[in-house]
Swiss-Prot record:
GO molecular function: metal ion binding; rRNA binding; structural constituent of ribosome
GO CC annotations, alphabetized: ribonucleoprotein complex; ribosome
Family membership noted in the UniProt record: Belongs to the bacterial ribosomal protein bL31 family. Type A subfamily.
UniProt keyword annotation of rRNA-binding present: yes
NCBIfam families linked: L31, PRK00019.1, PRK00528.1
Name this protein carries in UniProt: Large ribosomal subunit protein bL31
Recorded name of the encoding gene: rpmE
Cofactor, how bound (note): Binds 1 zinc ion per subunit.
């Protein structure tokens, strides 16, 4: 086996925009990274997720194009 072919696996500090700090290890090559969202502030993990009502959107689409019909002239 060849020696020294793997990247260095070092400590990494990930800082979220909400202020949450996560310490982990990575071969990224950086000491710190900045995140937009993390498990402490993401709506899915915090339970503040909003469901989009697609049924109303489909009904609105059908209503908009209900009067149109395909007329093929031969």
């Amino acid at each position: 086996m060849r020696a020294d072919i793997h990247p260095k696996y070092e400590k990494l500090v990930a800082t979220c925009s909400c202020g949450n700090v996560i310490e982990t290890r990575s071969a990224l090559g950086k000491e710190t990274i900045y995140l937009d969202v993390c498990s402490a502030c993401h709506p899915f993990y915090t339970g503040k997720q909003k469901n989009v009502d697609t049924g109303g959107r489909i009904d609105k689409f059908k209503q908009r194009f209900a009067g149109m019909s395909r007329s093929i002239k031969r």
